[in-house]
């Protein structure tokens, strides 16, 4: 019904306009350097293209006031050193960061995370994923890649194939496609899941990426510069 569709579109537009999605960029002190400035800025610039992201916060254990990110629209939140230990998880970092944000009376409708190691991420994907949270009754959605190549699990001397549908694999050993999570590419969830550290529990959905080039990982500026002219 045209009139009903028009009403639903208007309702969604209002919801979209009022929705407050915040994004956290977790960066360890070792990576908060001028050598990695391109990776940091490319992530920030990509997030800024989304009209649905209302605030960007860098969560870091970098001890000095940062001159690396001179941007009034980017909040720097200093976190304890122990949140960079191997025993700590992304959920620990997000929980601490959200608590610091909310302690000033600043609350959001959804919270997302983006790591600097994906400098070629597509800003349109960010919009699509936030809209999924708006439009569907789910707890968390994260970026992913559908892998057709053979995927193995285990130690080198005890490997077991868990998936793969490539023609290079013998037909009797094809187990279907596997989904590789790209959580650091972009993940969006609800604040309650961050507070309760249940980001990856409940009703979870993946958002399959179509352009493999946008999933390339660069862990420093040297890798970024080597690839930049090729893409």
Regions found by a protein language model. Name each.
Residues 63-112, 120-124, 128:
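Short phosphate-binding loop-to-helix
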Residues 92, 96, 116-210:
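Conserved core of the sugar-phosphate nucleotidyltransferase
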Residues 34, 84-90, 216-218:
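Short, charged, surface-exposed secondary-structure boundary motifs
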Residues 53, 106-108, 135-139:
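Short, high-confidence coil segments that cap the C-terminus of an alpha-helix
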Residues 82-86, 149-151, 212-215:
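A short acidic, often aromatic-flanked loop/helix-cap motif at beta-alpha or helix-coil junctions
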Residues 8-60:
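N-terminal glycine-rich phosphate-binding loop and ensuing alpha1 helix
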Residues 60-65, 192-194:
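Short, polar loop motifs at secondary-structure junctions
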Residues 1-17, 178-231:
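Conserved alpha/beta core of the MobA/IspD/sugar-nucleotide pyrophosphorylase nucleotidyltransferase superfamily
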């Amino acid at each position: 019904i045209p009139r009903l569709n028009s009403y639903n579109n208007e309702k969604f537009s209002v919801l979209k306009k009022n929705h407050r999605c915040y994004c956290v960029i977790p960066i360890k002190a070792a990576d908060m350097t001028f050598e990695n400035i391109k990776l940091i800025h490319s992530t920030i610039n990509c997030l800024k293209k989304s009209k649905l992201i209302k605030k960007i916060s860098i969560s870091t254990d970098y001890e000095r006031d940062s001159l690396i990110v001179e941007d009034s629209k980017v909040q720097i939140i200093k976190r304890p050193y122990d949140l960079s230990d191997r025993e700590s998880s992304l959920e620990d970092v997000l929980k601490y960061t959200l608590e610091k944000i909310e302690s000033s009376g600043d609350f959001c409708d959804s919270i997302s995370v983006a790591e600097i190691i994906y400098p070629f991420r597509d800003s349109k994907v960010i919009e699509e994923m936030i809209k999924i949270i708006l439009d569907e009754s789910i707890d968390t959605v994260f970026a992913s890649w559908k892998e057709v190549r053979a995927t193995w699990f285990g130690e080198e001397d005890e490997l077991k194939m868990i998936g793969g549908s490539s023609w290079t694999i013998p037909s009797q050993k094809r187990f279907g496609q596997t989904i590789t999570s790209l959580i650091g590419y972009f993940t969006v969830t609800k604040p309650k899941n961050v507070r309760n550290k249940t980001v990856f529990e409940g009703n979870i959905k993946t958002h399959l990426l179509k352009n493999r080039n946008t999933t390339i990982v660069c862990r420093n500026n040297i890798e970024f510069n080597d690839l930049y002219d090729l893409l």
